[in-house]
Amino acid sequence: MLDAKVAAKIDENPFKQDFPLLAGHPELAFLDSAATAQRPACVLDAERRFYETMNANPLRGLYSLSVAATAEIGRVREQVARLIGAVDEDGRPLAQDVVFTRNTSESLNLVAKSFSPTVLKAGDEVCVTIMEHHSDLIPWQQACRAAGATLVFLYPNEDGVITDKEIAAKIGPKTRICAAAEVSNVLGIRLPVEKIAAAVHAQGGYMVIDGAQSVPHMAVDVRALGADFLAFSAHKALGPMGIGVLWGRHDLLDAMPPMLTGGEMIDSVTEQDATWAPVPEKFEAGTQDAAGIYATGEALAYLTQTVGYEAVAAREAALVAYAWERMGQLDFVELIGHPDASQHHGVISFNVRGVHPHDVASILDMSGVCIRAGHHCAQPLLTWLGVENLACCRASLAFYNDQNDVDRLVDALTQVWTVFHGRD
C-alpha cells in the first residue's frame, strides 16, 4: 500500500502510469470518475488472462477449465465479502451472501422487486432521501405503488446535511424500509447512514444502502453501517462495466423469490413447477460475465492493496481541497453543496453563471477536460436545490488525478467565461 502522506502530494502522480488510457493520452484530464472509473492495466490483463487460460462456463462443467472458472468466481465472491465486512464471528467471509448482478441499478431493483413484497403492505412507509440516484428512487416508487405504501423523504439542511431531527421526524412506526446512498453522487457528502439504520431498526424496519459512490473511495463495513442490503458496481471501483454486487443478510435473501429465472438458478424443474437453488445462485440466472467477475477481483486488489483506502482518502481529500479553493477564486463559478471542501468526497458540483452546463462541458472537452453535465440521474434533488435548467456540472476526482488536472479544469473554465462574456 502507498503511504498516505506520499499519496497526498498532488503535484506528483505515481498512479497514471498504471492506467493505459491516461498514460496513453496525456492530453486528457479525466474528471468523471463518479460516472465510471478508469481501469488499471492489471484489470485489463486479468480479463484477457481469463479468456486465454480458463475460458469455460462456471458451474456447468466437470472438466478442469470449468472447475477452475467456478473456483475463481468463488474466490472473488469471498474477496468481496471481506471487502465489505461481511464475515462471521471468526472472520470468515460470508461469500454465499454476495450476489453478482449487472450493476448497482439491478441490485437495488432486485431488493425492491423481490424483498419489498415480503414485508411491505398497504399503509406502510418506505423512506428515502431526496439525494438518491434515480436507481435508488424509482424502484421504491414502484414498490410503494404496488403495495399501497407511502414514499417518505428525508431532506437535508442548507449545507446538504441530514440532521438527527429530520431522521426522528420522518422515521416512525410505519417505516418498513429505508434506502439511502452512503455518498451523494451530486453533492459528494456522506450521509449518516448509521444513524438512519439505527432509527429504522428501532422501528423493526430494514436498511438498504447504495454504496456506488462509497465503496470506490472508503472502507465499508456492512455491520458497522447497520446495512441489511448493500449494492455497488465494479466499474466505479476500477473494475469492468457490467458487474454489480448485492450483499444481503442471509435470512432475508433466503426468503426472497428470484427476480429472473432460467439456467443454473434452479434446484429442480417439472413440467408444471420449479424450485430454486440456494443463495446466491437463485439470483444469478443464466451465464454471467465470468471474465468480468474475475477482473473485478483484480480491481479490488489493486484498490485496497496496491493503493489502499488510506492513500485513496488522503489524495482525494487533497485534490478536492485544492480544486475547491481554486474554483472558489473564480467569481463566475457557483459551487454547489456544503461550504467545507472536506465534506465533498471526490465530487464537486458547480455551474458557470449564465452558461448552460452542456455548453460548459462541450467547451471543456475542447481542452481535453472531461466532466459530467446534466441532472446526474438526480432530478428530484436538483429540483429541491432550485438549480437552474435542472442541470449542473460535476467534476469528480479520483486518486489517479493530480494537481495538473485541476489546473487544466480551472484554465478551461476561464476560457468558457471568455467565450461567452469576453475578457471583461
Could you say what each language-model-derived stretch is?
Residues 1-424:
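Pyridoxal 5′-phosphate
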